[in-house]
Regions:
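Extracytoplasmic thiol/disulfide redox context detector
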Residues: 17-158, 172-175, 179-205, 221-233
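Mechanochemical coupling/switch segment within NTP-driven translocation systems
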Residues: 160-163
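Short strand-coil-strand connectors
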Residues: 55, 211-212
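Positively charged n-region of N-terminal signal peptides that target proteins for export
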Residues: 1-5
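Bacterial N-terminal signal peptides
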Residues: 6-15
């Protein structure tokens, strides 16, 4: 026991010091930038920098808050973008918390892989992503209509949602430009779509989420397919 006490003491002392340093940096940032509210401070493992998160913004500073750096930090040895990796983790969600009953569901093959995509009916990049994903089998795609691009986007989203076959209406319109067949009027959950997107920070379309909660911005099908596969492992 006597041999373990010093190690435990040192670990506790190190943790306390780290927490004290992070608290000091937090106070320093908030003092330097009057009115700013820091969400988190984390000591990084590189260059004695501290990671600062304010809302959706991530930047770095030194212990004394004399310098601030906003941009990407690249590990020259591995060529990894450390900032991008960290932002991916910070922007992750719990996939199981998504209200999938508000999404258009399409199952291909056994549907064992899954992805959720926020899409505007008039988004050209959404159409490009939808077309690229046609080549994927054994996948379930949950499409949340997110009508934010045009004034007519909400009406088009309503028409698609109220169609007799939502998935067919959506893909016919996105891939072939076919107008959705007129269906009976229904209460399309436009307000719920918009509230959901705002809640999880969806700012543009397409925005996709894998089952492990990772967020992918834009039409990047190759990267998305890779991440979808990794999420299922």
């Amino acid at each position: 026991m006597s041999l373990r006490l010093p190690a435990l003491f040192l670990a506790a002392a190190f943790t306390a010091t780290a927490l004290a340093d992070e608290a000091s940096v937090r106070r320093g940032v908030e003092a330097r930038f009057d009115g700013i509210k820091v969400d988190s401070v984390t000591k990084t493992s590189y260059a004695d920098l501290y990671e600062i998160v304010v809302g959706e913004t991530l930047f770095y500073t030194d212990e004394k808050v004399n310098f601030v750096f906003k941009g990407d930090i690249i590990d020259a040895r591995s060529q990894k973008n450390l900032t991008e990796e960290r932002q991916q983790k910070l922007s992750a969600i719990k996939f199981e918390d998504l209200p999938l009953d508000l999404a258009i569901k399409q199952v291909r093959g056994n549907g064992k892989r899954a992805v959720a995509i926020f899409s505007d009916p008039f988004c050209p990049y959404c159409k490009s992503l939808d077309r690229a994903l046609l080549r994927q089998d054994d996948i379930t795609i949950y499409t949340f209509l997110y009508p934010i691009l045009r004034a007519e986007s909400p009406d088009k989203a309503r028409t698609i949602w109220c169609a007799p076959d939502r998935a067919k209406a959506y893909y016919d319109f996105m891939l072939n430009g076919r107008e959705p067949a007129a269906g009976p009027s229904c209460n399309a959950p436009v307000d719920k779509w918009l509230a959901l997107g705002k809640k999880i920070g969806v700012r543009a379309t397409p925005t996709s989420f894998t089952t492990n909660g990772e967020r992918i911005l834009g039409a990047r099908p190759e990267e998305l397919v890779k991440l979808i596969g990794e999420a299922q492992k």
